[in-house]
Amino acid sequence: MATDNPRAVDDQETHPKDRLNRVVFYVSALIILIFSLTTILFNDFANRALNQVLDWVSSTFSWYYLLAATLYMVFVIFIACSRYGNIKLGPKHSKPEFSLLSWSAMLFSAGIGIDLMFFSVAEPLSHYMHPPVGEGQTYEAARQGMVWTLFHYGLTGWCMYALIGMALGYFSYRYNLPLTIRSALYPIFGKKINGPIGHSVDTAAVIGTIFGIATTCGIGVVQLNYGLHVLFDLPENLWVQTALILVAVIITIISVTSGVNKGLRILSEVNIYVSVGLMLFILFLGNTEFLLNALVQNVGDYLSRFPSLALESFAFDQPKEWMNSWTLFFWAWWVAWSPFVGLFLARISRGRTIREFVSGTLIIPLLFTLTWLSIFGNSALHNVIFDGNIALAETVLSNPAHGFYDLLAQYPWFPFIAGVATITGLLFYVTSADSGALVLGNFTTQFTNIDHDAPRWLSVFWAVAIGLLTLAMLMTNGITALQNATIIMGLPFSFVMFLVMAGLYKSLRLEDYRQASASLNAAPVVGNVDILNWKKRLTRVMHHPGTFETKRMLNEICRPAVHAVAEELQKRAVQVDVLEVPLEEDEELYHLDITIHLEEEQNFIYQIWPVRYIAPNFSERGKRGKQFYYRLETYLYEGSQGNDLVGYTKEQVINDILDRYERHMTFLHINRISPGNRPLFPDPKA
């Protein structure tokens, strides 16, 4: 049996095959196709239209982006620090799929990308030359430049990823809902998420995600183009950039159709080590003492100035162009990427508590990101301020993609290091496109199993769509067009994120009601109940039954008990289903499920699962050389109850079912009478 809740309703025999979500797919594809073709065919018109819409969005919603980003952060930290932080992303009996070290390594990889190579030099130098307020080319401008860079890549953005990852993991692994954004809205809209509301939400997620990925790929293409120019004297133009996009699309198609994606994952892991090596190279071959002092100062400045930066709208200074190019762009970019990275974070975090998840997401990748930005950013600033290389800063202002390579040119073995940086950037670029195609395919598929991936042809389509959109943006106005489009396209999903917060909080409140109902004593049982005497109890504790005895217990005790309860409820006009599903690991055994339907409220599900464990050496079964034994464990909707029915009588099994049912009814009652609450619950068979 798997470590997570083994439910009959999850068995593939009871479900249809995965299928395309036609509405989300066709609407998203049509919007992207129209946008891309219009941009490619009518360059000037598209550029003017983007600028006009951007002016409207920035003048109308700049305050909103700042406030929204801060509220996302406050919500995530509040949930993690509250009592809800103990709730697991999955049933309460679930265990993490990955060890702490492996999980940390995967979180670490989430913090690395080609955009870090681009902005680690370009942003600090841009702010140093032209800060949003105050005089440029001063020590204060240098400090501001690093603080703004850390702020744009800091806690606020990672909280957006954590919010979506937390919601996806909670609703998918605890409530068995699809691994899509609409699932988080079930507590608000109920089954309406299967209609236009859900389609709109998922479409907004797809549109935002593909623009976020296209922006990253576009930035990567421009930077790689310059890297190839440095190494092989290739020209910097749209033709070379188009060829790079085509190469990425082809590699992605090969990856998703031939199974070499495992090889790409290995390469991306190697890439992490190479990236760390590149960072250490700059640290130890540069002015190490200065860089370490600057790192400590940067962290201190970031922490001390963070409260004022979080809501800094420059209401009086009004550097509109600066806001559009930096803070608004970054917040929209984080919003656009949040479904993509959130899905990745959710998938690797099943079985962890919300507090563990948020802590890991906010600390591990953030530490690396801040260290990378500080080392490269301060190296560039040191080269400009103390070595007098003002040309580096001027180059960044005119061609930001040149900054990273021009900084590397100041160090020994430049051709070799530039080659390593180019290969690293290319792999980051390809893996972003590859992962993006997979995630977009998942968002446009209706799965019968949340662990499935989208069909290959769908991932191929999205790989081509990412390439087409990236090319369209580069043809319009390069990186500026990508930034402008991200600010615009990230806006709709930013509203969805507030609905995600509301749905998640509403569902977490139900955990309080469930806990309260579980703590209440069931009604006293009247009559002569055969309570296990101490000798029977001792025999039961020491017993480790095999397949034969477990099957006998199921057939002679558990099955009659379950059917007795079902028949009595059916006499009272209650809809009840009983299922017997063979185990995959031992077809002689089966698990028993009884589902009591409660109309619009959450159904009561009680399951009896034979769970196989390794027989302990001290047991009689272990001494006889038998490898396994079984426990008859009970599962409710929220997961394992931790008990074992082996040795129970029929009446005791019936009493256990009724105790759990009564507590469930108490839970529904508490939820029903709570102020302002509507009892909308996920349908486990949906």
Curated annotation (Swiss-Prot):
<keyword id="KW-0813">Transport</keyword>
<feature type="topological domain" description="Cytoplasmic">
    <location>
        <begin position="172"/>
        <end position="203"/>
    </location>
</feature>
<feature type="transmembrane region" description="Helical">
    <location>
        <begin position="485"/>
        <end position="505"/>
    </location>
</feature>
<protein>
    <recommendedName>
        <fullName>Osmo-dependent choline transporter BetT2</fullName>
    </recommendedName>
</protein>
<dbReference type="InterPro" id="IPR018093">
    <property type="entry name" value="BCCT_CS"/>
</dbReference>
<feature type="topological domain" description="Periplasmic">
    <location>
        <begin position="287"/>
        <end position="325"/>
    </location>
</feature>
<feature type="topological domain" description="Periplasmic">
    <location>
        <begin position="225"/>
        <end position="237"/>
    </location>
</feature>
<feature type="transmembrane region" description="Helical">
    <location>
        <begin position="61"/>
        <end position="81"/>
    </location>
</feature>
<feature type="topological domain" description="Periplasmic">
    <location>
        <begin position="378"/>
        <end position="412"/>
    </location>
</feature>
<dbReference type="InterPro" id="IPR000060">
    <property type="entry name" value="BCCT_transptr"/>
</dbReference>
<feature type="topological domain" description="Periplasmic">
    <location>
        <begin position="122"/>
        <end position="150"/>
    </location>
</feature>
<feature type="topological domain" description="Cytoplasmic">
    <location>
        <begin position="347"/>
        <end position="356"/>
    </location>
</feature>
<feature type="transmembrane region" description="Helical">
    <location>
        <begin position="413"/>
        <end position="433"/>
    </location>
</feature>
<comment type="similarity">
    <text>Belongs to the BCCT transporter (TC 2.A.15) family.</text>
</comment>
<keyword id="KW-0346">Stress response</keyword>
<dbReference type="GO" id="GO:0005886">
    <property type="term" value="C:plasma membrane"/>
</dbReference>
<keyword id="KW-0472">Membrane</keyword>
<comment type="function">
    <text>Uptake of choline in the presence of high salinity. May primarily serve for osmoprotection.</text>
</comment>
<feature type="topological domain" description="Cytoplasmic">
    <location>
        <begin position="82"/>
        <end position="100"/>
    </location>
</feature>
<keyword id="KW-0997">Cell inner membrane</keyword>
<feature type="transmembrane region" description="Helical">
    <location>
        <begin position="151"/>
        <end position="171"/>
    </location>
</feature>
<feature type="transmembrane region" description="Helical">
    <location>
        <begin position="238"/>
        <end position="258"/>
    </location>
</feature>
<feature type="topological domain" description="Periplasmic">
    <location>
        <begin position="44"/>
        <end position="60"/>
    </location>
</feature>
<dbReference type="GO" id="GO:0022857">
    <property type="term" value="F:transmembrane transporter activity"/>
</dbReference>
<feature type="transmembrane region" description="Helical">
    <location>
        <begin position="204"/>
        <end position="224"/>
    </location>
</feature>
<feature type="transmembrane region" description="Helical">
    <location>
        <begin position="23"/>
        <end position="43"/>
    </location>
</feature>
<feature type="transmembrane region" description="Helical">
    <location>
        <begin position="460"/>
        <end position="480"/>
    </location>
</feature>
<feature type="topological domain" description="Periplasmic">
    <location>
        <begin position="481"/>
        <end position="484"/>
    </location>
</feature>
<dbReference type="Pfam" id="PF02028">
    <property type="entry name" value="BCCT"/>
</dbReference>
<feature type="transmembrane region" description="Helical">
    <location>
        <begin position="101"/>
        <end position="121"/>
    </location>
</feature>
<feature type="topological domain" description="Cytoplasmic">
    <location>
        <begin position="259"/>
        <end position="265"/>
    </location>
</feature>
<keyword id="KW-1133">Transmembrane helix</keyword>
<feature type="transmembrane region" description="Helical">
    <location>
        <begin position="357"/>
        <end position="377"/>
    </location>
</feature>
<feature type="topological domain" description="Cytoplasmic">
    <location>
        <begin position="1"/>
        <end position="22"/>
    </location>
</feature>
<feature type="topological domain" description="Cytoplasmic">
    <location>
        <begin position="434"/>
        <end position="459"/>
    </location>
</feature>
<feature type="transmembrane region" description="Helical">
    <location>
        <begin position="266"/>
        <end position="286"/>
    </location>
</feature>
<keyword id="KW-0812">Transmembrane</keyword>
<feature type="transmembrane region" description="Helical">
    <location>
        <begin position="326"/>
        <end position="346"/>
    </location>
</feature>
<keyword id="KW-1003">Cell membrane</keyword>
<feature type="topological domain" description="Cytoplasmic">
    <location>
        <begin position="506"/>
        <end position="686"/>
    </location>
</feature>
